[in-house]
């Protein structure tokens, strides 16, 4: 029973700390941070011709003169199902259909010909999941909701040429400025109907990291991009409530707290101008998830159910995560003036490896390797104002959880539709 209880709390905390994942069951990447970039599936680290470069590679800001503003939102419509528990049952349970709107905003201003500053505000977390009240995974999650907002001020500069061609550098701060999480689940180890564990929490303090990048263009038709996003140490605190559970094992409620260092990431990108109106890019993204090997949680009050040789006072527990490093390969193309003046078309493909090992897989984040496909377009209404649109389809590989110690044991299937719409303004 102790292990089950801890999985409930730990799974909730993992949602808010899974820095490359969104909060619904399959754990989607945060790369859906710009409508225009969505059209190329986030293959944008060497693109450097749009204000959302703040997120993908801040060095690209130095290409932008004057005032640039872009805003938009992506509608994330995940669909997930679980079949099991195996081998006893082959019954299918479907996650409730939910849709989530995740906004983004970017602005930049050219201070001089070679120096540009900007800021981005985006919400890579703003999702949730809701499973049936009675299903094999109700000890891990019935309903979860999450929202986290980031701000990312940045500055970029174009260096004087010195033999490598055009070289641009940029850096910014990534700051988690607010966040909240909720989770509810059951503890079936007790023969009490309608028992419920509820958790609500917030980011304790703003979490600060940085991103930095460089762009090198040895010739006009070729740009190489390299960018780094630092790890971020995040502090989280909240309250856990225990309803209809024995007082001898659980207090009525207690505060909880933890901190975790989110993993760093690196991107190497190549952008090639094939024709005057045709550009292609390939990005290789690596996440250092191996830093997330365990999660320690502290409790303000003694929880008798947690008393053990490892936690004699019942106020601390450590969970094994043992995540692996993971990579993404993203490719995108852009074709302008496609038969209509002012129309630009985009497309993309991506493969996204998941970091979660089989033995620590759970129903909050039953992450799986994913294939992604995208199409997008921009239309210049005027020379200074464009409408951006994109659509992404994500198909996750079927994930078998029968080796998981967290349960439930069965098979997960997940897909998602992500349409997005926004605008870009240049002054």
What are these regions (language model features)?
Residues 78-80:
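A generic, lipid-embedded transmembrane alpha helix
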Residues 16-17, 66:
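Repetitive helical segments and hydrophobic/amphipathic motifs
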Residues 1-9:
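Positively charged n-region of N-terminal signal peptides that target proteins for export
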Residues 11-12, 23:
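Cleavable N-terminal signal peptides
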Residues 50-76:
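N-terminal, post-signal-peptide region of Sec/Tat-exported proteins
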Residues 24-41, 45, 66, 82-92, ...:
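Outer-membrane beta-barrel porins/channels
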């Amino acid at each position: 029973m102790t292990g089950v209880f801890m999985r409930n709390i730990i799974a909730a905390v993992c949602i808010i700390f899974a820095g490359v994942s969104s909060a619904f069951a399959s754990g989607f990447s945060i790369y859906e941070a710009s409508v225009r970039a969505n059209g190329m599936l986030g293959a944008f680290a060497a693109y450097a011709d749009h204000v959302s470069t703040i997120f993908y590679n801040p060095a690209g800001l130095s290409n932008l003169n004057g005032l640039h503003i872009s805003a938009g939102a992506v509608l994330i419509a995940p669909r997930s199902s679980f079949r099991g528990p195996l081998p006893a049952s082959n019954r299918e349970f479907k996650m409730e259909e939910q849709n989530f709107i995740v906004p983004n905003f970017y602005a930049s201003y050219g201070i001089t010909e070679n120096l540009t500053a900007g800021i981005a505000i985006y919400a890579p977390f703003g999702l949730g999941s809701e499973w049936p009240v009675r299903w094999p995974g109700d000890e891990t999650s019935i309903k979860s909701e999450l929202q986290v907002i980031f701000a990312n001020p940045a500055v970029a500069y174009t260096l004087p040429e010195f033999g490598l061609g055009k070289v641009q550098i940029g850096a910014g701060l990534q700051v988690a400025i607010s966040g909240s999480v909720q989770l509810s689940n059951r503890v079936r180890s007790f023969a009490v109907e309608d028992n419920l564990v509820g958790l609500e929490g917030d980011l304790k303090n703003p979490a600060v990291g940085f991103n930095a990048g460089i762009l090198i263009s040895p010739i006009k038709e070729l740009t190489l991009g390299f960018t780094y996003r630092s790890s971020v140490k995040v502090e989280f605190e909240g309250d856990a409530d225990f309803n209809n559970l024995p007082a001898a094992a659980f207090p009525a409620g207690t505060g909880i707290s933890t901190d975790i260092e989110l993993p760093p990431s690196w991107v190497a990108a190549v952008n090639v101008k094939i024709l005057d109106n045709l550009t292609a890019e390939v990005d290789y993204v690596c996440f250092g998830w191996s830093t997330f090997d365990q999660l320690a949680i502290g409790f303000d009050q003694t929880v008798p159910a947690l008393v053990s040789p490892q936690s004699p006072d019942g106020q601390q527990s450590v969970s094994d995560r043992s995540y692996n490093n993971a990579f993404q390969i993203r490719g995108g193309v852009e074709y302008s003036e496609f038969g209509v003046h002012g129309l630009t078309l985009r497309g993309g493909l991506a493969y996204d490896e998941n970091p979660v090992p089989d033995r620590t897989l759970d129903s909050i984040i039953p992450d799986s390797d994913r294939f992604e496909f995208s199409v997008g377009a921009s239309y210049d209404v005027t020379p200074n104002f464009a409408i951006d649109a994109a659509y992404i389809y994500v198909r996750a590989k079927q994930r078998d959880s029968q080796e998981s110690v967290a349960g439930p044991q069965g098979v997960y299937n997940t897909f998602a539709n992500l349409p997005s719409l926004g605008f870009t303004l240049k002054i």
